[in-house]
Amino acid sequence: MAAAKTLLEEPPYAKRQKGVKLDTVGFFFLSLWLVCLQIVLDKGNDADWFGSTWICWLTFISCVGGICFLISQIKGKNPLTDLSVMKDRNFFFGTVIQVVLMGVMMASSTILPTMLQSMMGYTSFLSGISMVPRGAGCLVATLFSALFISKIGERKMVFWGLVILGFGGLAFGEINLQISLMNIGFPNFLFGVGMIMAMVPLIELSCRTLRNDQLTNASGVQNLLKNVGAAIGTSLVTTCISRFGQMHQNMMVGKLTELNPAFTERLQSYAMSFVSNTDMASATHMAKNVLYNQLLQQSTLWAYIDTFRLFAIASFLIAPLVLLMKRKNLV
């Protein structure tokens, strides 16, 4: 704090701002919107989302708070945030891309260790080690961006970063329960490279066409929306895994019938392995339990695979938005 106070100073346009007042009404509605939204996102999946009355009420209050906040910022004399920056094309599309990017980044960082621990028996330490290649990818991309951004341009750097991130999601979509840490490393490395290649130039590119006196406000708006995007992304993937798991389970259960030769053969094989310790009826029941547990495991695995593929789709969909952003500085 002492170093910051000593070394940092406010720019001239900030020093000229006098008599700045806090928009208490806007701050109240902002707090109401975000607090209710965060509770809904944190507890929604556990409470069956809109099957719960209190989730519905909190969602309604959050929507009302968000709408009132927007109205207060547009109509107020001293708004908490100046939303006119969203009229800037670079800032608007840059913020949209960053919101989605933060959602993908935080969501993937959340579900990968969970998958490794719950489905593959990894310890917390090993699941943490699995994220090391992502850090290495971030480091490599940081060096690469610094060296080549002036040669290829920010827009191309962001575009190819999102494409690489998408291929990382597709690579995660090929996982199975027999993979090793090495198999996790390559997709994670791609995620790290893609995120940094896209995020670092995008921050500068999105604010390039704004005036100096708009930068502080724009940074606040952008960071707020990125945090909301990260919270929504983390919450959505939890729901996606739950819903996709149920969907795949329902699809697979239809194959567990005596009309399916593969099921019958595997059932008999398991039953014969158990019959030496019990009677045939009990052995058959035990064999069915084993097969059903395998079905649950595979349906959950496919839920994770589908979720990772959604990350890839999201990355590919937002990549063309970079082409709508301007190259030149504001004159």
How should these model regions be labeled?
Residues M1-T6, I67-I71, L170-E174, R243, ...:
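Membrane-embedded alpha-helical segments of multi-pass transporters/permeases
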Residues M1-P12, S72-P79, A136-G137, N250-R266:
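Hydrophobic alpha-helical transmembrane segments
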Residues L41, L116-Q117, F148-I149, L236, ...:
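Interfacial helix-cap and linker-helix signal at transmembrane-aqueous boundaries
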Residues I97, V221-L225:
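Hydrophobic alpha-helical segments of secondary membrane carriers
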Residues K226-L317, L321-L324:
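Hydrophobic transmembrane architecture of multi-pass small-molecule transporters
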Residues L22-F27, L34, Q38-I39, D48-N217, ...:
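Transmembrane core module of solute transporters
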Residues M1-K5, L30, L58-S62, D306-L323:
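Symmetry-related core transmembrane helices of the 12-TM Major Facilitator Superfamily/SLC fold
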Residues M1-F27, S52:
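Helix-loop-helix hairpins in multi-pass membrane proteins, especially solute transporters
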